[in-house]
Amino acid sequence: MMTTARPIILHHFEKSPFSEKVRVVFGLKNIEWTSVLISRIMPRPDLMPLTGGGYRRTPVMQIGADIYCDTQCIIRELERRFPEPTLFPNGYQGIGWSTAMWTDRSFFQNTVNLVFGSLAGQVPQDFIADREKLRGAKFDVPAMTAAIPQMRDQFRAHLQWVEIQLGDGRAWMSGDTASLCDVNAYMNVWYVRAHLPNADEVLAEFGNTRAWENRMRSVGHGRSSEISTSAALDIAASATPQTAILADTNDPNGRKPGDRVEVTLTPMSPEQREAHLAEYRKGFTINPCH
């Protein structure tokens, strides 16, 4: 197992579904990490200097002065640093990564609509305003509430895919060992369980999925301690970035380290941030322009 001399710091909040994905990876790999709890809405004054000011999504991983935004980027770095036990026990990395296109988009959007439509008047106005800025569109809770019957149908269809995959008695989505496929799919079940009082009723017919959910929960979140946001900022200020400067020589658009780029959070957010391209290698790392 590879280790790091600098603490792995996760900036997150407890009910963040994408943070839960990373926390479960910590559990699967038995990683020691440091927790920094942040507000679930903007502003986040001690985190914003690390991310360039405008990044709204959660979580953010920090290792010294290296900042990792986007869950797939975070998980990729954790797999690189801690290759055993692997998140790809059968070697199918493409399948592991690509399942996120299902679980993080259509499945998750359905889950969000079901959860907030069910919570209705309990959703705070400041949260609604924050999510409207993130999405660039109305966060229409009454419309979500009106669509609950359709959302239940769609959520049931997504869960049926999980149920079928587990239907031959396997313990995990890919077989005998937990993988990134499990982490990806579990996020939506966890989110419903964390928010809906009637989660038992929603999940009742899916026996294989409920047993798998219990196994996923038992994975835990690794070994964690907690520090303040200001302490994490001090750690970054006293360190220097360690990310290697690499380039993708096959990039058809000719981008290279040092280029100025605009970064848009897809698929929901219209917001753009100007940055310097620090690394470009089957994905990229950016340094914000201040």
Predicted ranges, named:
Residues 227, 231, 237, 267, ...:
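Sequence termini and other peripheral, non-core segments
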Residues 1-131, 270-290:
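GST-like domain detector, emphasizing the conserved glutathione-binding G-site
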Residues 252-271, 275:
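Short coil-to-beta transition motif at edge beta-strands of beta-rich domains
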Residues 87-88, 172-174, 255:
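Hydrophobic beta-strand core residues of beta-sandwich domains
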Residues 36, 87-98, 140-147, 224-238:
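A short, terminal or domain-edge coil/loop segment
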Residues 103-218:
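GST-like fold's C-terminal all-alpha helical module
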Residues 178-180, 228, 255-258:
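Short gly/pro-enriched beta-turn/loop segments at secondary-structure junctions
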Residues 201-253:
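Catalytic cores of secreted or luminal carbohydrate-active enzymes
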